[in-house]
């Protein structure tokens, strides 16, 4: 059974462009980092992941992002998650309580020198082992996307497309390489409370 959910037109072109502008205008952007070392510290490792990142906290964001979250990001995630749960209804029965994680990342990968180059999963250390589901929304059309290795599946980066999948070791993934042009996305998680 395929546990990768793909939902198109979850955000409009205008909504995606507003989030991209928010990202580009932010003075809080930083180089993309990895935290898979188990300590939770941010490490810049361009051979693994190279690009730009903006971490946003649901509990502590500015008014502009708060409005984007309230008006369309969270409703879009709710809509997509509702569709995903139709395929996997057991998610609401027999599991411990779970909810959206406080933080998420807006990311940009620009050109063949940038991307997330290595296979990884989203729940691979004791620090993030409570993650159960990953959500990612592509903010623009790009000539690349995400590669899942088991099952083998490529998901093309398409503006407004939501992708949901299990966070664990069963779903290793990476960016499709080479990265051609600009690719913008938002990535976050649903975790056990």
Feature locations, PLM:
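Fe(II)/2-oxoglutarate oxygenase catalytic core
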Residues: 1-134, 138-162, 170-193
């Amino acid at each position: 059974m395929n546990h990768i959910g793909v939902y198109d037109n979850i955000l409009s072109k205008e909504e995606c462009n507003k989030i991209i502008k928010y990202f580009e205008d932010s003075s809080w952007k930083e180089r993309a980092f990895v935290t898979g070392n188990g300590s939770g510290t941010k490490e810049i490792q361009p051979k693994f992941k190279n690009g730009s990142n903006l971490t946003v906290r649901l509990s502590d964001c500015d008014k502009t992002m708060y409005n984007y979250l309230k008006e369309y990001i969270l409703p879009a995630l709710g809509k997509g998650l509702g569709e995903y749960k139709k395929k996997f209804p057991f998610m609401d029965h027999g599991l411990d309580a779970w909810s959206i994680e406080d933080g998420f990342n807006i990311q940009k990968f620009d050109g063949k020198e940038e991307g997330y180059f290595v296979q990884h999963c989203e729940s691979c250390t004791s620090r993030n082992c409570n993650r159960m589901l990953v959500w990612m929304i592509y903010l623009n059309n790009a000539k690349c996307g995400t590669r899942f290795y088991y099952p083998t599946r490529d998901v093309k980066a398409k503006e407004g497309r939501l992708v949901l999948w299990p966070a664990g070791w069963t779903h290793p993934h990476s960016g499709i390489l080479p990265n051609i042009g600009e690719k913008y996305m938002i990535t976050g998680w649903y975790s056990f409370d």
